[in-house]
Curated annotation (Swiss-Prot):
Listed GO biological process terms: cell wall organization; peptidoglycan biosynthetic process; regulation of cell shape
Topology class, membrane: Single-pass membrane protein
Spans through the membrane: 8-28
One of the record's GO cellular component terms: peptidoglycan-based cell wall
Subcellular location: Cell inner membrane
Protein's name in the database: Biosynthetic peptidoglycan transglycosylase
Organism listed in the record: Neisseria gonorrhoeae (strain ATCC 700825 / FA 1090)
EC number: 2.4.99.28
GO molecular function, one term: pentosyltransferase activity
InterPro entries referenced in this protein's UniProt entry, alphabetically: Glyco_trans_51, Lysozyme-like_dom_sf, PBP_transglycosylase, Pep_trsgly
Reaction(s) catalysed (UniProt annotation): [GlcNAc-(1->4)-Mur2Ac(oyl-L-Ala-gamma-D-Glu-L-Lys-D-Ala-D-Ala)](n)-di-trans,octa-cis-undecaprenyl diphosphate + beta-D-GlcNAc-(1->4)-Mur2Ac(oyl-L-Ala-gamma-D-Glu-L-Lys-D-Ala-D-Ala)-di-trans,octa-cis-undecaprenyl diphosphate = [GlcNAc-(1->4)-Mur2Ac(oyl-L-Ala-gamma-D-Glu-L-Lys-D-Ala-D-Ala)](n+1)-di-trans,octa-cis-undecaprenyl diphosphate + di-trans,octa-cis-undecaprenyl diphosphate + H(+)
Function: Peptidoglycan polymerase that catalyzes glycan chain elongation from lipid-linked precursors.
Superkingdom field: Bacteria
Length: 233
């Protein structure tokens, strides 16, 4: 009996260690190499297949300096205004999320920073529970420890979901505006950013009033967004 208990404890611990060793190795690789595709992309494409949707993956990696500063500022203004200065976690946002989750009785809000969102996109899935949030935090800490802010942001910009099968700034810019991501205007960048929290909902409701309102809010805020110090755009 004792041996069985030992195995029941050792097995999940071993899986946790193995998975995080795998993740860490990939984080080191991604400092210089673009991901072939992310875990979230694979999960989403499998979901579309199961739903009987004929969706092709449109994912086009471009370097950081070929993405409009307008889009960078819009995303920071909307998703993580403290991105340039924090170590991967926005503690005020996390405390607010905990309060909202406690009031609702389930994990709805995550207080996720850009770094945390990237951790989810690269390695995890859409599930909302405290175990997954803990793993997300561990990956975020590893990534922030060995990867500079510009590279984290570059990975994020290239992995965001924007429509059915459309991932990354370049694919989104060409899908919506028939132009490279480097040429996005402020209005276009704000509109793309407004899609980020719920891209598939807005794909089905493109004339949503909420989308228009969010676009206008992003436009007002993006001028004061602070990019990482090493940004040379």
């Amino acid at each position: 009996m004792f041996r069985i208990v030992k195995w029941l404890i050792a097995l999940p611990v071993g899986i946790f260690i193995f998975f995080n060793a795998y993740v860490y190795g990939n984080i080191i690789t991604y400092r210089a190499v673009a991901p072939h595709r992310t875990a979230f992309m694979s999960m989403r494409m499998k979901q579309f297949e199961q739903e009987g949707r004929d969706v092709a993956l449109d994912y086009r990696w471009v370097p950081y300096n070929r993405i409009s500063t307008n889009l960078k500022k819009a995303l920071i203004a909307s998703e993580d205004v403290r991105f340039a200065g924090h170590g991967g976690f926005d503690w005020d946002g996390i405390q607010n999320a905990i309060r909202r989750n406690r009031n609702s009785g389930e994990v709805k809000a995550g207080g996720s920073t850009i770094s945390q969102q990237l951790a989810k996109n690269l390695f995890l899935n859409e599930s909302r529970n405290y175990l997954r949030k803990g793993e997300e935090a561990a990956i975020t800490a590893m990534m922030e420890a060995v990867t500079d802010k510009n590279r984290i942001f570059e990975l994020y910009l290239n992995s965001i979901e924007w429509h059915y099968g459309v991932f990354g700034a370049e694919a989104a810019s060409r899908y919506f505006y028939k132009k490279p991501a480097a040429d996005l205007t402020k209005q276009q960048a704000a509109k793309l950013t407004a899609l980020v929290p719920a891209p598939l909902y807005y794909a089905d409701h493109p004339k949503s009033k909420r989308l228009r309102n969010k676009t206008n809010i992003v436009l007002r805020r993006m001028g004061s967004a602070e990019l990482p110090e090493s940004d040379t755009d």
